[in-house]
From Swiss-Prot:
Signals that turn on the gene: By thyroid hormone.
Species whose genome carries this gene: Xenopus laevis (African clawed frog)
Record InterPro entries: ConA-like_dom_sf (IPR013320), MAM_dom (IPR000998), MAM_domain-containing (IPR051560)
Listed name of the protein: Thyroid hormone-induced protein B
One Pfam family, short name: MAM
Domain MAM positions: 26-169, 170-330, 341-500, 509-669
Residue spans crossing the bilayer: none
Secreted in keyword set: yes
Membrane topology: Peripheral membrane protein
Leader peptide range in chain numbering: 1-20
CDD domains referenced in this protein's UniProt entry, alphabetically: MAM
Cellular localization per UniProt: Membrane; Secreted, Extracellular space
């Protein structure tokens, strides 16, 4: 599962029944039809079961990799809503290519669908998943996509889709689906549904809080089933996928205060727990209100946990879980915008500064790329930070670059690009320290070791500190012969562990070529071929030393030694939906080599096969570094984007592209820093 989480195992009879009256937009019980959902051509058809109740697709209808797609009608959310899906995926669990079920959102006027949720886990029972949807002024559609695996017995079924107003974490436990809450299984002690004239407890249970009568429902856990000291029962919420910040409130009741422990934790995708609430002194036999601030910056679950000291500890009951975007203190729930803590140094040093007592060990520069030095990582021709040059590097000299203060008790992921080069040693010439503002001592958390020169490498560090702190980038010039040059660019800060953020779905229009070719196709007949490669190209004095994404990843390039002068290679995007208004295309290209030919970008509209529109072109050697290209185009027809590379006069004609990004709307900065071959004179002259 892309965003793995606990799900509630349901038998078919335990799944909630649609309430009488009108079904809310986006909901469907699949009794005798797919409601307002429609199947998308030319994909497989979802089949309504002959007895109703669900739709399905299986291996008898199609082959491995084939899709069945259901598209909702146009939807509009004036309020925050929750989409709940009851589904089942059947087949062999050992299959190397299992079936999957995906949920996308398709915003009006955009070419791409955004992945909200995905599952591959097989089950003999129905499962339930909950997905938070932000309120929006833009219309959208929900896309349900089933992808068949290679097993001959593969099948995917959807029992019900239900759209309700409110947050998925909220619950009054009055419906059979229990809002997706489930037990973290314990063979002895578990949470049960109470109320509704249910008589399955040895204790005398209370009325519920919602209705205040015997017909209402709530969750409870009873100590009578305890077999071991402080045995734990956990009730786990649906996974919170969409970031929220505010006040979580709930009502609870207990029979004996001194004989049990009641806690609330959060748990992220990495399995890390964080206690956010603990029961104090309360009135027994009454419903008590609890409130706690909840900041779900990354996907996480909320866990209600009870530990009993013995079988005579009574019960703990839980009801009416609510969430408000206003903090419990009454202030609007505020996110710390981690993006503001980063910097690409294009417009200045952002919130970074140097230690005035030590002088300026770091310099913000823009250099002219040549065979010995690269441009910056952001655009290839922009600004970056550099240390240990002839003018800043002195024996036994430290240069410290301080970042902004970051609030404590939050998990962060720090990413940045660095490059070490020069003719001197580079080991330990760049390090990262943590400076806690209430401590004098700095803690070293990362250092650069001997790395390939002539390439920007990405580093990432996960940090969690209880108190506010600053990240410090330290350059060290040990001696005249051990003073490697250190460069730094594109520092970014995000909430959550770096491992967790890697599991969050990427932007749908983004392709880094790290895993595959992103659906790009090639023209094979009498054409050259684009190759997906990692590292440097085989021919010297042409091509990049590494990719643009991380420095050690993949990119696409043409190998000039396998082509003849003037031969072309075309890389063609998958069909893109027609949308009104401007679209923005961004990518990075590398054209280095004395014999470099041409790189062209075309727009091909459906039905206009012979009328390609040239959007952008470059001819000849451009730079030893990756350069950024950005352009706008419009197409109210289905279309494709074509990258065409033309081999130059010699084998030193490798051309590469990487990090392609399609975005809706005009480009934020549509100006291309390099309008033709050659450079401007607005560069710093740096001696190394």
């Amino acid at each position: 599962m892309m965003l793995s989480h606990w799900v509630l195992l349901l038998s078919l009879g335990a799944v909630w029944l649609a309430e009488g009256g009108e079904i809310s937009p986006g909901s469907c019980t699949f009794e005798n039809s797919t409601c307002a959902y429609t199947s998308a051509f030319p994909f497989l058809q979802w089949t309504v079961n002959i007895e109703g109740h669900y739709v399905s697709v299986d291996s008898s209808n199609g082959l491995r990799g084939q899709k069945a797609v259901l598209i909702s009608p146009d939807l509009h959310l004036a309020e925050w809503s929750c989409l709940r899906l009851v589904y089942q995926i059947a087949g062999s669990e050992s299959s190397p290519s299992p079936s999957s079920l995906n949920v996308f959102v398709r915003p009006e006027g955009e070419s791409f669908d955004y992945l909200l949720w995905s599952a591959e886990e097989h089950s003999d029972s129905w499962l339930i998943s909950s997905i938070d949807l932000k309120n929006t002024t833009k219309r959208f559609k929900i896309i349900l996509e089933g992808v068949l695996g290679e097993n001959t017995m593969s099948s995917i079924a959807i029992f019900e889709v239900k759209m309700t107003t409110g947050y998925c974490i909220e619950c009054d436990f009055e419906e059979n689906h229990l809002c997706g809450y489930m037990n973290s299984w314990n063979p002895n002690v578990n949470w049960f549904v109470g109320g509704g004239n249910v008589k399955n407890s040895h204790s005398i249970l209370p009325r519920d809080h919602t209705l205040n009568n015997e017909l209402g429902h709530y969750m409870y856990v009873d100590s009578v089933y305890v077999k071991h000291f402080q045995e734990v029962a956990q009730l786990v919420s649906p996974l919170i996928i969409t970031p929220i910040s505010g006040c979580l409130s709930f009502y609870y009741q207990l029979q004996r205060e001194t004989s049990n422990i009641f806690l609330v934790h959060t748990r992220d995708l990495h399995g890390s727990y964080d206690e956010i609430w603990k029961m104090g002194a309360v009135r027994q036999g009454e419903w008590n209100l609890a409130e706690v601030d909840l900041n779900a910056h990354v996907p996480l679950e909320v866990i209600f946990e009870v530990a009993f000291n013995g079988i005579q500890a009574g019960y703990v009951a839980l009801d009416d879980i609510l969430f408000s975007p206003v903090s419990c203190s009454g202030q609007e729930g505020m996110f710390f915008d981690a993006r503001e803590a980063g910097c690409d140094f294009e417009e200045g040093m952002c919130q970074f500064h140097q230690d005035d007592n030590n002088g300026s060990g770091w310099s913000r520069v823009k250099v002219k790329p040549n065979a010995y030095q690269m441009g910056d990582h952001t655009t290839g021709l922009g600004y970056f930070m550099i240390a240990n040059t002839r003018f800043t590097g002195q024996p036994a000299y430290f240069g410290r670059l301080y970042g902004p203060s970051l609030p404590g008790n939050i998990q962060y992921c720090i990413r940045f690009f660095y490059s070490l080069y020069g003719f001197y040693k580079t080991i330990d010439s760049l390090a990262v320290y943590i400076f806690e503002e209430n401590h004098v001592v700095q803690e070293k958390i990362w250092s650069a070791h001997e790395t390939p020169k002539g390439v920007w490498l990405q580093a990432e560090i996960s940090i969690h500190k209880p108190m506010p702190f600053k990240v410090v980038f330290v350059s060290w010039c040990k001696s005249l012969w051990d003073c490697g040059i250190a460069a730094l660019d594109d520092i970014s800060v995000s909430i959550g562990s770096c491992k967790i953020s890697d599991r969050i779905p990427p932007l749908p229009g983004k392709c880094t070529f790290e895993k595959n070719d992103c659906g790009f196709e090639q023209e094979w007949q009498r054409r050259g071929i684009w190759h997906r490669i990692q590292g440097r190209t085989p021919t010297f004095y042409t091509g990049p030393n590494g990719d643009h994404t991380s420095g050690v990843g993949y990119y696409m390039y043409i190998e000039a030694t396998n082509m003849v002068f003037g031969q072309k290679a075309k890389l063609i995007s998958r069909p893109l939906r027609a949308v009104a208004g401007k679209q923005c295309l961004t990518f990075y290209y590398h054209m280095y080599g004395a014999g470099t030919g041409l790189l062209n970008v075309y727009l091909t509209k459906e039905g206009d096969i012979n009328k390609d529109t040239l959007l952008w072109t470059r001819k000849g050697e451009q730079s030893i570094t990756w350069l950024k290209a950005q352009m706008e185009y419009e197409s109210e027809q289905q279309h494709k984007i074509v990258f065409e590379a033309v081999r130059g006069i010699s084998i030193r004609s490798d051309i590469a592209i990487d990090d392609i990004l399609f975005q809706n709307g005009p480009c934020n900065d549509s100006s291309d820093p390099l309008q033709s071959s050659g450079y401007s004179d607005n560069f710093n002259n740096i001696e190394f």
